[in-house]
Amino acid sequence: VTSTSQGPESGARAAHPDHLGHVIFITAAAAMGGFLFGYDSSVINGAVEAIRHRYDIGSGTLAQVIAIALIGCAIGAATAGRIADRIGRIRCMQIAAVLFTISAVGSALPFALWDLAMWRIIGGFAIGMASVIGPAYIAEVSPPAYRGRLGSFQQAAIVIGIAVSQLVNYGILQIADGDQRGKIAGLEAWQWMLGVMVVPAVLYGLLSFAIPESPRFLLSIGKRERARKILEEVEGKNVDLDARVEEIETAMRREHKSSFRDLLGSRFGFLPIVWVGIGLSVFQQLVGINVAFYYSATLWQSVGIDPTDSFFYSFTTSIINIIGTVIAMVLVDRVGRRPLALAGSCGMAVALAFEAWAFSADLVDGKLPTTQGTVALIAAHVFVLFFALSWGVIVWVFLGEMFPNRIRAAALGVAASAQWIANWAITASFPSLADWNLSGTYIIYACFATLSIPFVIKFVKETKGKALEEMG
């Protein structure tokens, strides 16, 4: 997805007040892809144990069924930019909405384990598309003065999607009397959990018809008047629209369609800035954040918490995730991206260390001792809070901003794919690692959180307040 932005001379660093509400609506509609991203990613949390028992599978096979969606995510993220540059951002969103719908229906009504895995791959492809198209589209329609905050809508939508999925799972479990395989209208509870995603998927598709195409894409295919009209909608009549159109066209003439070859450097394969993007993406996942959203119900049950309470704690964790994201949205354009990243890394490292200590205790009657159990619950929530107010938001903002125009599309796709591959590695390995040593697993995650601190200090540059043309 190739995007450009106005330079400082354009006078468009802030939207006209009359148009900011319209820009917010457009951003929120596009961020519905993020909502589905969060919902589809974490809804499986409520079905893990039911799938294990329904198909009588061990931890290794179970992990592959859960993690296989991430293969689709990586493919979707790698190809979405090229698809969007060819057919447009809106059409890309509509394709993703259809795939989300198909995945929801198929996952709720699987014939066997193999087709459940297939439906999850399809849903993963849609998630991967949404992970790239959402931030890029939002960056293209957002005035620079608001770009950080509007860019945060994507992560806000993701965490709201996570929270809603956990709330829906908890509600369905209550209806099924606490049994994930309890019958509701002929289907097991876990099938309803996966099938409910049809509702937001259809809403996403409908909203995509209510928002305009990116003016930058329209200019790239020669639709100058349509692009001019949309720029007027999002930036106001007081802006010199002819100058803005000329400015974008000039920037587009200076750049070319990015390809994988453009990312190659003389040392270590990729250009240094691409490695920084990959590093940000990978560190975001290697701290183990998605263990909290894919396996938390199973994790709490493994240390003696009953199923209903484990679902409730999964929901409270997702609420903390929302609170942290709101904090990040408020601070990202005030204190900058790097300070948030460093604060988050420090907080996560400490919280993960406490979790590792708590899980090192021997179980008493199948439960953690009271002190360790309390510490584990508090530390898990603190970990999610520090992730949400930092890496959960700033990585997406960085990836939308940090690359030069000439390589942005390809670099964003590679970085997003790296994120999904790292996510897959953590998701696929956790059940086996937990069987090996739960405390040791959290020590590994704490080490990655600690290593992210020198990485940010040495390699990551601040992007706060810069126009996209200044990057790289």
Describe each model-derived feature in a short phrase.
Residues 1-226, 230-232, 252-472:
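Alpha-helical transmembrane bundle of multi-pass membrane proteins
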Residues 234-236:
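Short helix/loop segments within enzyme catalytic domains
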Residues 238-250:
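Short, well-structured alpha-helical segments
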